[in-house]
Regions:
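Short, glycine-rich nucleotide/cofactor-binding loops
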Residues: 3-18, 205
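N-terminal glycine-rich phosphate/adenylate-binding segment common to multiple enzyme folds
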Residues: 65-151
Length: 267
């Protein structure tokens, strides 16, 4: 059994979400291969090759992967899919965009946001907004999975790299093109990887009061989150939202202020 894990990167570094999610592969027997794509990514390829547990790293250095499109990445994985039984990625925006398409192309079911692996065909995931845990068994010959990063610790980095292979981007579809993106800039840590989070709800009453949380967060080195009600009221932008319809978080310290209900939905 061989596993292929898609590794994401940003700003010249392997993403924290991928480092955590790839730890799930240690619960699967057999070799683990990584796939990383982009252009001018020699330094991040060198870093990724040192992830413990990887026996091989494939990379594509091509301008067409400067911005990930589901159609292109899916086709790239399909080009090498014959060698693999398991396909994993972190349950990020990219992972949630690509893996369902891959599953459809392979004519198998996709299992979302697993938090543990019990056996070769048995996986654990949360349901009902985290209030119940489901054990899912599949008879599909190929398993396509997204992994909840917050359920795993970051993979260790070794002192030497694994085998590195460069592959070519061939037969890439052209049914969509990247137009642009708008990124929110913040001095605060990213919510999904923050160790400390301070979060406010509708009781904050307005956006000006939310700025008080920023001052506390600065002292704590924390990220700032918000409930859906606070976001819907326009107090803060959408990317602040935590919970069932927002970002899944698992900090070491979570401070929930001013009317945030059902905190289990935030984990």
């Amino acid at each position: 059994m061989t596993t292929l894990f898609f590794i994401e990167h940003a700003n010249g570094q392997v993403s924290d979400q991928s480092l955590k999610a790839i730890s799930a592969t240690s619960q699967i027997d057999g070799d683990v291969h990584g796939l990383i794509v982009g252009s001018d990514i020699d330094s991040v390829v060198a870093e990724a090759s040192k992830i413990e547990g990887l026996s091989k790293l494939m990379h594509v250095d091509d301008d067409s992967f400067n911005n990930i499109l589901a159609e292109n990445l899916t086709q790239l994985i399909l080009n090498v899919s014959g060698d693999y039984e398991y396909f994993l990625a972190a349950a990020t925006t990219t992972g949630k965009n690509v893996m369902p398409r891959l599953a459809a192309k392979l004519d198998v079911s996709q299992i979302s946001e697993i938090i543990a692996i019990e056996g070769p065909d048995t996986f654990i995931r949360t349901i009902y907004a985290g209030n119940a845990i489901a054990t899912v068994q599949t008879s599909d010959p190929k398993k396509v999975l997204t992994v909840r990063p917050t359920a795993f610790k970051s993979a260790a980095m070794g002192s030497s790299g694994c085998e590195i292979t460069k592959i070519n981007a061939e037969n890439m579809p052209s049914i969509s093109e990247f137009i642009g993106e708008e990124l929110t800039k913040s001095d605060r840590p990213e919510l999904t990887s923050a160790k400390t989070i301070i979060s406010g709800g509708r009781g904050m009453q307005n956006g000006e009061n939310f700025e008080l949380l920023d001052k506390v967060a600065e002292k704590l080195g924390a990220a700032v989150g918000a409930s859906r009600a606070a976001v819907d009221a326009g107090f803060v932008p959408n990317d602040y939202q935590v919970g069932q319809t927002g970002k899944v978080v698992a900090p070491e310290l979570y401070l929930s202020l001013i009317h945030i209900s059902e905190p289990t939905r935030q984990w």
